[in-house]
Amino acid sequence: MKFMKTNDLREAYLKFFESKDHLRMDSFSLVPKNDKSLLLINAGMAPLKPYFTGLQEPPKRRITTCQKCIRTGDIENVGITSRHGTFFEMLGNFSFADYFKKEIIPWAWEFITEVLELPKDRLYVTIYLDDDEAYEYWTTLTDVDKTHIFRLGKEDNFWEHGAGPCGPCTEIHFNRSEEIPTNADEFVKLADEDKIIEFWNLVFTQFDGDGKGNYEKLANTNIDTGMGLERLATIMQEKNSIFEIDTLENILSEVAKLANVKYGENQKTDISLRLITDHIRSITFMISDDVMPSNEGRGYVLRRLLRRAARHGKTLGIKEAFLCNLCDTVIRDSSEAYPELNSKKEYIKKVIKIEEDKFRETLDSGMEILNGFISELKAKNEKVLSGVDGFKLYDTFGFPMELTKEILEDEGLSLDEDAFHEEMKVQRERARSARKVSNYMGTDVKTLDIIPAEVETVFDGYDNDTLNAEVKVLIEGEDFTDAITEGNKAIIVTDVTPLYAEMGGQIGDTGVIFNDGFKANVLDTKKNIGGKIVHFVEVVSGELKVGDTVTIEVDKVRRENIKKNHTATHLLDKALTEVLGSHVHQAGSYVSNDRLRFDFSHFEAMTEEEINKVEDLVNEAITSVTPVVTEVMDLQEAKNSGAIGIFDDKYADKVRVVSAGEYSKELCGGTHIDNTGKIGLFKIISESGIAAGTRRIEAVIGKEAYKIVNEKKDLLKEISTKLKCSEKELLAKLDQQVKELKEKDKEITALKSKFASMGIDDIVSSSRNVKDINVISYELKDVDSDTLRDVCEKVRDKAPNSIVLLMSANAGKVIICAMATKDAVAKGAHCGKLIKEISSMLGGGGGGRPDMAQAGGKMPEKIQEAIEESYKIVETLAK
């Protein structure tokens, strides 16, 4: 049988459908655009949903893609079986109201038998029970063996997802065995045994279902096919597992080399090898699409995958961080199809390294605590770890719940998941209440998304601030209307407009729409999901009807300020790359008339020196009075010219490139000034972190920037007046004041310690004898942790056969210290166990050794209650 490498298979498929007049599109980002139903793209058709639903016009009626996908529904099986994985590539060809069954069936057969040269005697086809049309085309337009066609039911060969577009499908299978099925039952049995594997699904979207079994024929039919690249490669390379195909085997071999083990010799190490091989692919591709590790959403998926892989690496005996280097193999083998991997290589490696190092630091500490929990459970002959303890591991050490579960399962134990989720409930409720729910693009009007496709709207405002236009659509509330009148808010859609619709971070223009008998203030301009430009207005006077001619005028002053801020944002982007490095990528922006905001990938807070350098570079570009030029060119020409852009966005064939001399060049559809000198002064007002690995800069320009400078100047003057020195002497004066304050602090701390030590005899005398152990539980007033530990040690040394528990409330928090003598430990005293329960009572956490432990809490009002409880706890611990 013909052998083909994975990368060659991908190219062969895409080329084949290009030859059938399909537009080859690059894979979309793993991060869905305008689709809140998905966390990550999980199917080839997922990014194309707006085309299938008719909300957006496809760039062509025929499209072919190889889409990167991630599915984590079966994550627990990854590594355990040889076929489960989280990352895969889905080959697909799609028709939007163009060709249908008659075309795709013979094309599919042509590709697999003539291009791939798969043996026909091993190919089988399934169709839906009553899809006679598909049967006819298979038997008349191909030479498939009729005895290899089986009719199956709805569960196998009918695609639907609730109400909406649906239809029958036909699946193509490959028989790996020597057994030949003679009927549908035998076929299904062999398929269930993985002797026959399905590798290509052709979905015929031809019905509109109501979700109750009733179907109407669609006016326009679509084709949606999907073929897993890795599964196809197992057939073409005659492998039994996806982990044996060329691209994955390269990764697996590298992991085995690092761990000094051989694949296939040990079931347990094989699981770890497969898991790491799969997960590093997902990790690499997710980061290349600017997903960052975090504790929520897709960032949590990434963190979970990375930490699972890191832990399994440690299980294999790999001592150092290794994932950041393992991704090199993924990038090398996949960058031809996904060039963004190469361009972001250092960025990907750095994100992985930081997260892996962070996890390795906490893993040892967390494992020590978890192993303690496991030992306690086994000693008590219990099988379930409490949700409280599981949540502490998550909250304190960043252990994902799933990781705790996996480690427990390895020991034959489990986690009380219900109780764990209860512990998280408060945090989730807080997050939920903070989350705002809105419809597409933040508006609450749904009707705007179903503006008829034949209504065309054009932006013609790069060189115009006033245009005459025809009113095409009017919307008031949730309804289309023929007319709008004074005093109402509405949406106006015109054939042309000079107003820029919010896009690419730039806010929408405002202005006025008027004619002789009508006037409305435009409050905002946006695009609906289909790209139609809509004006949100408040009617000032008169009446407007569909078909009327109006004049649209932009707010020129506001537009000019937006243009200045937008150009300044481009200069900032370039300056950040120069100062911080090539790993900097735009993660979001907000450009308004009075300020700008820029989110970017970076791993730590910027230093004052870096912020100053960035400011200086931007201001140098401004004072150089460089012309800002806009050119329209082919997308590939723009890329070749060095223009930067978020290439995950699907640009048109022709794109706008905005250049500020040789300094900055970006793909951008926004509005800009014609000269950098018009910006004036640029001033950064804040730099902060908004997510793991993502920073945010807020800045102002022109008058707003000068205002900031003057405010700081006035503040400096006021401070120097209060400190009775000149502005030049301020720093020396402050240094002197800080030095004096530190000396006073030392004196106060020494006095507190001395005062606390003076009462040691009183503390010792408070001892209670509990089962032949002297228990000393005491509250000290307003001392720091060093003083508390010092006093605790002195009390222990002065009180034989004792366990000492001291607590102090300081600035609304509780610090706790416990120490025990050797003879008390021998009798069952255990500081770590005591402090674990006490800190939990006080709303905190901690632990430690039998002879010494420390912790913190948040509820000083419960200290006295904790003191009384401590005697009971020691009583349960004493032998």
UniProtKB/Swiss-Prot annotation:
Entry's EC annotation: 6.1.1.7
SMART domains: tRNA_SAD
Localization per Swiss-Prot or TrEMBL: Cytoplasm
Gene Ontology BP terms: alanyl-tRNA aminoacylation
SUPFAM superfamilies: Class II aaRS and biotin synthetases (SSF55681), Putative anticodon-binding domain of alanyl-tRNA synthetase (AlaRS) (SSF101353), ThrRS/AlaRS common domain (SSF55186), Translation proteins (SSF50447)
Cofactor: Zn(2+)
Binding note for cofactor: Binds 1 zinc ion per subunit.
A single GO molecular function term of this UniProt record: transferase activity
GO cellular component term of the entry, any: cytosol
Alphabetical UniProt keywords: Aminoacyl-tRNA synthetase, ATP-binding, Cytoplasm, Ligase, Metal-binding, Nucleotide-binding, Protein biosynthesis, RNA-binding, tRNA-binding, Zinc
Catalyzed reactions per annotation: tRNA(Ala) + L-alanine + ATP = L-alanyl-tRNA(Ala) + AMP + diphosphate
Pfam families the record matches: DHHA1, tRNA-synt_2c, tRNA_SAD
Binding site for Zn(2+): 566, 570, 668, 672
Function of the molecule: Catalyzes the attachment of alanine to tRNA(Ala) in a two-step reaction: alanine is first activated by ATP to form Ala-AMP and then transferred to the acceptor end of tRNA(Ala). Also edits incorrectly charged Ser-tRNA(Ala) and Gly-tRNA(Ala) via its editing domain.
Domain observations: Consists of three domains; the N-terminal catalytic domain, the editing domain and the C-terminal C-Ala domain. The editing domain removes incorrectly charged amino acids, while the C-Ala domain, along with tRNA(Ala), serves as a bridge to cooperatively bring together the editing and aminoacylation centers thus stimulating deacylation of misacylated tRNAs.
Family note: Belongs to the class-II aminoacyl-tRNA synthetase family.
HAMAP family: Ala_tRNA_synth_B
Name this polypeptide is given: Alanine--tRNA ligase
Taxonomy of the source species: Bacteria, Bacillati, Bacillota, Clostridia, Eubacteriales
